[in-house]
Regions:
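Solvent-exposed alpha-helices and their adjacent loops that cap or buttress functional pockets
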Residues: 80-82, 104, 126-129, 145, ...
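Active-site-proximal loop/turn and secondary-structure-junction residues that shape catalytic pockets
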Residues: 27, 49-51, 73, 93-95, ...
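Short beta-strand segments
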Residues: 46, 114, 133-139, 177-179, ...
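Charged (often Lys/Glu-rich) extended helix/loop segments that serve as interaction or gating elements
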Residues: 250-416
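Conserved, mostly hydrophobic/aromatic
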Residues: 28, 48, 71, 78, ...
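Short amphipathic alpha-helical segments
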Residues: 57, 80-81, 124-125, 225, ...
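Active-site loop/helix belt of alpha/beta enzymes
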Residues: 140-276, 366-368, 377
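A charged N-terminal "starter" segment
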Residues: 1-124, 129-131, 165-171, 203-207, ...
Length: 416
């Protein structure tokens, strides 16, 4: 990828016809280092959030060695770009072919499940292997999240103890996991879920080797200002100390959004202005799926090739709706988005914080979807991991020192 200091430098230096994804590798590396330095256990990157090759390469270079995968294509990607990495197949429902290939072709030994039928598939397709790590996914409350993931996966509490006992009989190592929901705004949600998991483990009357607190770690978006990330880690650490598990039990987490949300933005061109409607060359079927369908708020800013300093237009702003390039009327993003009132055809809008699920959900519907990737070095929006832009303007970003000693539990000798 070609590197520009800022997206505005790109806009001023060349014609921009198709959407341009602005990658920020430093933001991925910074987030990866933060989790490795602060989370008191194993950190798995949830590949679903952004499976781009450049993201995997940066994470691997930054020290990430454990990946949460959901399909054979994701497994193949990780195997290609991160050759020494461990993988956990944490999709609770997998095809028999996927289980078999993951185990025999790629050496995957960690599998999630939330029912006995899935457990039987795993056992049958691995020929009742004795080296399996089985992770039982529990259903927990998603009340603390802005985007609930409850309802599709997770064994309900009234069945959980039996499921944990059954899995224990077939597992070399046994774990429990849960997901508190996407963009969790309450650190206490992890504590509640962990203590519920502890209760179910005690009810099952067996030992577990792994507690996986899943994902849900938040990012900063317009109107969404979560607590500092270290408050989430503190809540998890404190709850882990209270859990009724062995001293040598491992603690895992699966950040996706938190690792990559700051990593990408898209430059999209205004093709038509019609009242308060802006027609763009990217939209709901491209990298703005969440903006359209989940009504997710993303930051925007205008770039003009010929304008005043910093590419700014008039100080007066107006509220706009956005429409994507396809012929589908559902390709609409109601917003409202505050942009300069004199915005015009040919102007470039940068839509930020698209690193999580922007690329992953993009399609080529109607023949649209082709994009160019470039790297940029700026950090225009608030970050969970580094100093705010107004604190670091025109200087190198300064890392906020939040690292604490990693209080890992003593590692005792594993069961034979």
């Amino acid at each position: 990828m070609h590197t520009y200091h800022t997206p505005l430098d790109l806009v001023r230096s060349r014609h921009v016809e198709s959407p341009v994804v602005c990658a920020r590798p430093d933001r991925v590396a910074q987030a990866s280092h933060w989790f490795q330095d602060n989370f008191p256990g194993e950190v798995l990157y949830a590949v679903k959030a952004n499976p781009s090759a450049w993201v995997l390469d940066v994470l691997y270079k930054a020290g990430t060695r454990f990946f949460d995968v959901a399909s054979i294509p994701e497994i193949q990607l990780v195997a290609e770009h991160c050759p020494a990495a461990r993988m956990a197949f944490l999709h609770p429902v997998k095809s028999r072919e996927s289980i078999r290939r993951a185990y025999y072709e790629f050496g995957v030994r960690i599998f999630a499940l939330d029912c006995e039928a899935e457990l039987n598939k795993i056992l049958e397709e691995t020929n009742h292997a004795r080296d399996l790590t089985l992770i039982v996914r529990l259903a927990v409350s998603n009340d603390g999240a802005l985007f609930s993931l409850a309802g599709k996966f997770g064994v309900p509490a009234y069945e959980a103890a039996d499921m944990i006992r059954t899995a224990r009989a077939h597992a070399d190592e046994l774990g429990v996991s849960f997901h508190v929901g996407s963009q969790c705004m309450q650190p206490s949600a992890y504590r509640s879920a962990m203590l519920e998991a502890s209760r179910l483990i005690a009810q099952a009357g067996v030992t577990v080797d792994i507690v996986d607190v899943g994902g849900g770690f938040p990012s900063i978006y317009p109107g969404m200002n979560p607590p500092p990330m270290d408050e989430y880690i503190s809540a998890i650490e404190d709850a882990f100390e209270e859990m009724m598990v062995l001293e040598n039990a491992d603690l895992w987490c699966e950040p996706g959004r938190a690792l990559v949300s700051e990593a990408e933005s898209v430059l999209t061109r205004v093709e038509l202005v019609k009242g308060d409607a802006l027609y763009l060359n990217d939209g709901a079927y491209g990298r703005l799926f969440d903006a359209a369908h989940a009504k997710w708020p993303f930051p925007v800013r205008l770039h003009r090739r010929h304008s005043t300093a910093n590419g700014k237009a008039s100080a007066e702003t107006a509220s706009f709706r956005l429409f994507g390039p396809t012929c589908d009327s559902l390709d609409a993003i109601p917003g409202p988005f505050e942009l300069p009132a004199d915005i015009a055809e040919g102007d470039i809008i940068e839509i930020g914080m698209l690193g999580a699920y922007g690329t992953a959900l993009a399609t080529n519907f109607n023949g649209f979807g082709s994009v160019e990737y470039v790297a940029v070095e700026d950090m225009p929006w608030p970050s969970m991991f580094v100093a705010q832009p107004d604190q670091a303007e025109d200087t190198d970003a300064t890392v906020i020192s939040l690292a604490r000693a990693r209080r890992r539990r003593p590692k005792l000798r594993r069961r034979a």
